[in-house]
Amino acid sequence: MISSYTFGIYPRSEELIEATRKNTENLPSLFQNMAASKGKSTFVDTKTNGGATMQFHANDPLSYQKMNSSDWNYVVLQAQSQEPSFPYGQVNAQTLPYADQLADTANQISSCSQALFFMTWGRENGDQNNCENWPSVCTYDGMDDLL
């Protein structure tokens, strides 16, 4: 689970795990309102750790407690905002194995669970802290293209 939300549509349920600031945008409420507009009842549970990486969530026992807390139909994972924009070798070594671990675990807990990946966001002015070493992230457009 990544800084996360858990959403459910009865009798189905969904869990969103994310590592970014989406918690400030009240995504669970937006999801509930959208489902309600279609006559669906929803259940929302959250786990948010702003700025946490996939590796953090894969190593956090609470991630697995949340996944085990219900028969989720969907487990939605979102990487920390910079994480997928880093060089491919770094993403392949430091992000994807943990994303796979979380997705595989969701499916092992319930064979009906489907892991979905929710695109993270590029920073308005790019990633200035990493710009010198990875120029592709110097601007929003450059960072967004990598995401």
Where on the chain are the PLM-derived regions?
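Short polar catalytic/cofactor-binding loops
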Residues: 2-7
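Conserved SGNH/GDSL esterase-like catalytic core that processes O-acyl groups on lipids
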Residues: 8-100, 111
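Short, solvent-exposed loop/turn segments at secondary-structure junctions
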Residues: 85, 125-126
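Internal, well-ordered alpha-helical segments in soluble enzyme and binding-protein domains
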Residues: 98, 102, 143-146
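A short helix->loop->beta-strand "cap" motif at the edges of active sites that frequently abuts
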Residues: 104-115
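Short beta-alpha junction loops
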Residues: 119-124
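Substrate-gating cap/lid alpha-helix
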Residues: 127-147
